[in-house]
A protein has these predicted regions:
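Juxtamembrane intracellular "pre-TM" segments in multi-pass secondary transporters
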Residues: 1-2, 175-208
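Helix-loop boundary and gating motifs at the non-cytosolic
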Residues: 2-48, 201-239
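Hydrophobic core of transmembrane alpha-helices in multi-pass small-molecule transporters
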Residues: 13, 82-83, 92-110, 209, ...
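Interfacial helix-cap and linker-helix signal at transmembrane-aqueous boundaries
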Residues: 30-31, 61-62, 133, 148-151, ...
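Helix-to-loop junctions at the C-terminal end of transmembrane segments
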Residues: 53-67, 150-151, 249-263, 349-350
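Structural signature of the two symmetry-related core transmembrane helices
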Residues: 70-84, 265-280, 362
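Cytoplasmic helix-loop-helix junction between adjacent transmembrane helices
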Residues: 100-134
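Symmetry-related core transmembrane helices of the 12-TM Major Facilitator Superfamily/SLC fold
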Residues: 157-174, 356-374
Length: 388
């Protein structure tokens, strides 16, 4: 069976197009709704916090049944259905419960789809970045489109746009075929805990938790931060889009990069550049040129680090535990890390100021760099051969 390149790419396009409505503008929508920074941080923490449980639960079911794509379809449907509740919610209580319900299903989707994509690619995992880049294209389309839209329309229109994108994400899952070699392994998890207990794997997860803690102030407050410095919604959208465009360029050349560089090297460089990026954003907001440079660094801080992580999980956990491995990566990094980062940035944004919050993000990346340098992938310097 040939790889359904455009259908896989289409899912990434619509999934990350949805994210392009969330990340830059959801905090603005909440602020417009009367929520303060602490409440915005808490709601953002709930949004990512369900990743701690949801991906692992769905990953366990997927590996047990061998029906990853069916789970993706069910979760995508309920995510779209529950999100429509935001069209009617009016207070913190309802926003919190709808956020939990919607995100429990939405956060289940991507880790399973990563596994489905890699199963389709079989012995060609280096092609992953060429498929994944369409997610970045989708993100850019919506972040620019919504930015222009919000210069002329109230931000209250945002939930309608996101709901439509969620429906499209669900629709495209219906036309994607199962991979030929996706099979059920039954309830046994032989070797799973043995893998997790390896010092290198524990260090890998710790590094990614710290990396996502550092990203939280950017995801939650960057647009509010730019608005405070009097940047328009269009400029804000362009800056977000620039970061993802840089990510696309990296994805285009990632196949060659994976053949020339170890995953360890890609991860270490990404962490080092992330440290500098958060310092630039925190201390140089008045200088548009430096903000542009910081956004270009998104290619490494998210794109490079994520591709390295996806491939390391693939190598660590093997075929039998792919669903659970990708889910564990998602839940610990984007879930636990994102939740902790959202909470700390929300509580300290007004108390200590934006410079302090972004400086602590840089410290988090610095610690992650040291851990990765000491423990991650030191004994497997030739892993590029498996990827090229």
């Amino acid at each position: 069976m040939s790889v359904p390149y455009w259908r896989l790419s289409g899912f990434y396009f619509f999934y990350f197009a949805t994210l392009g409505g969330f990340l830059p503008y959801w905090s603005l929508y909440l602020k417009n709704g009367g929520f303060d920074p602490i409440e915005i941080g808490e709601l953002s923490a709930l949004l990512v916090g369900t990743r701690i449980i949801a991906p692992n639960l769905w990953g366990l079911i997927a590996d047990h049944t061998g029906k990853s794509l069916r789970i993706i379809r069910i979760a995508s449907f309920f995510a779209a259905f529950l999100f429509t509740g935001f069209l009617f919610a009016e207070n913190y209580f309802w926003f919190a419960w709808i956020t939990i319900g919607f995100s429990f299903f939405w956060n289940a989707v991507l880790p399973q789809f990563e596994a489905v994509t890699l199963f389709h690619l079989k012995n060609e995992p280096h092609r992953y970045s060429r498929i994944r880049l369409w997610g970045s294209v989708g993100f850019i389309v919506t972040v620019l489109g919504i930015g222009r839209l919000l210069d002329s329309q109230p931000v209250a229109i945002l939930p309608v746009v996101i709901a439509a994108l969620l429906i499209l994400s669900w629709w495209i899952t219906l036309i994607i075929p199962e991979a030929d070699d996706v099979i059920s392994y039954g309830p046994a998890s032989f070797g799973m805990m043995k893998i997790i207990k390896k010092p290198e794997v524990l260090a890998f997860f710790t590094v990614n938790i710290l990396l996502q803690i550092s990203h939280a102030p950017y995801y939650v407050f960057y647009s509010i931060y730019l608005k405070h410095y009097h940047y328009s919604a269009t400029i804000t959208g362009l800056l977000w889009a620039l970061g993802v465009f840089a990510e696309i360029v990296l994805f285009v050349y990632m196949k060659g990069l994976l053949r020339r560089c170890t995953l360890r090297a890609i991860l270490l460089v990404s962490l080092l550049l992330a440290t500098g990026r958060w310092l630039i954003i925190g201390w140089c907001a008045d200088y548009l040129g430096l903000l542009i440079l910081a956004q270009i660094l998104h290619a490494a801080t998210f794109g490079g680090a994520h591709v390295a992580a996806i491939h390391l999980v693939h190598l660590y956990f093997g075929q039998q535990h792919q669903g659970k491995g990708q889910a564990l990566y998602s839940s610990l990094s984007f879930g636990l890390g994102g939740m902790l980062g959202s909470l700390y940035s929300g509580y300290y944004w007004e108390l200590m100021g934006s410079k302090f919050v972004y400086s602590m993000a840089a410290v988090s990346c610095g610690i992650a760099f040291v851990i990765a340098y000491i423990w991650v992938d030191r004994e497997n310097a030739q892993n590029t051969a498996a990827l090229g």
